[in-house]
Amino acid sequence: MNPLRPVDTLVVDIAIDNLSDNYSSKPSHISPEFNNVIAAGATEISGSTLCCAQLGLALVLTAVTGNQHHTLLFDAGPEGAIFLRNCRNLGVSLADVEAIAISHGHWDHMGALLDTLDHITRHNRGRQVPCHVNPGMFLERAATLTTGHIAPFQRVPSPDDLAEHGAQVVNSSAPRFLLDDCFYVSGEIPRVSSFEKGRPDHLCRRSAGEPWQPDPLIMDERYLAVHVREKGIIVFSACSHAGVINVLLNTREVFPDVPLYGVLGGLHLAGAAMERLIPDTMAHLKQFELQQIMPAHCTGWRALHALLNEFGEARVTPSAVGSRFTFG
């Protein structure tokens, strides 16, 4: 396996996240939304100049090494108009996106993808955009509600849909390095921890009319990793359906000679079944000695409180839509 190339600086724009938080004080490596929209050209703070929080996640990552910049989109959120509006308000140029990596096949991470591809190709002279997916993402999905009702999820775009909208589809289960080895997209995440058994309410089927089948493990999920020079590896785990401990164990196995610096993403510790895992998750996180834990999206407020109690404010820096994280 090729080494993950260290980058001098990594900038992460939070284009979609569940929460908006402009008023909490933030450490120096996080630029808040108010600052970012004014820097992008807004002349006032208003409803139209700010970002919209929305269930989902979309991250625009720019890796800088010397004079070289590489920009990757990791997920696109649930709905195109909001994602594109947020990027515009933040001054994020999607024409600079050189590749897209999708974490897993859920609507709140892929719903905006076709509109996003249309926008990118309109502004990059029609150049196809590599879009990295895996075959397990394209099943029909659903969840069993607390009422017992089965609620189908919106179908995600198919590989053919993606290609029709300007994607160069890379549909493979294998791990891969992207953009001069600045980004690593994992393969299937081994499920080895004793307590992370997936999402019990989750269902799937191959086509309409077939019976729904239990699908707690959501094996199509992948994580993203970046090595920031003099810090270590930052892991981006969009939903952590594999369990964040399994994600970090795999990262450490793949890159045994590089320390893990931080993790950003949804830890999926919300909902009665998942909240039972919070104590074990806190205990097992200690082994990684992370300097930054950046909960987002589906982490849940109970898990956020537990993280703050266990690791403190210096190490736990929650994500919010419109924020910009800079490492290095």
In which residue ranges do the predicted regions lie?
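Zn-dependent metallo-beta-lactamase
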Residues: M1-H69, V185-L224, V228
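Short acidic, glycine/serine/threonine-rich loops at helix termini
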Residues: S25-K26, L113, A142-T146, E275, ...
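Pre-active-site segment of Zn-dependent metallo-hydrolases
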Residues: S48-L55, A63-A99, L114-D115, T121-H123, ...
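Divalent metal-coordination and catalytic microenvironments
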Residues: L61, D75, C87, H104, ...
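Short hydrophobic-aromatic micro-motifs
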Residues: F74, L179-E188, I234-S237
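Active-site HxH/HxHxD metal-binding segment of metal-dependent hydrolases
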Residues: E98-V169, G187-G198, A283-Q291
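Cap/insert and terminal regions of metallo-dependent hydrolase folds
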Residues: A99, H106-M110, E210-S323
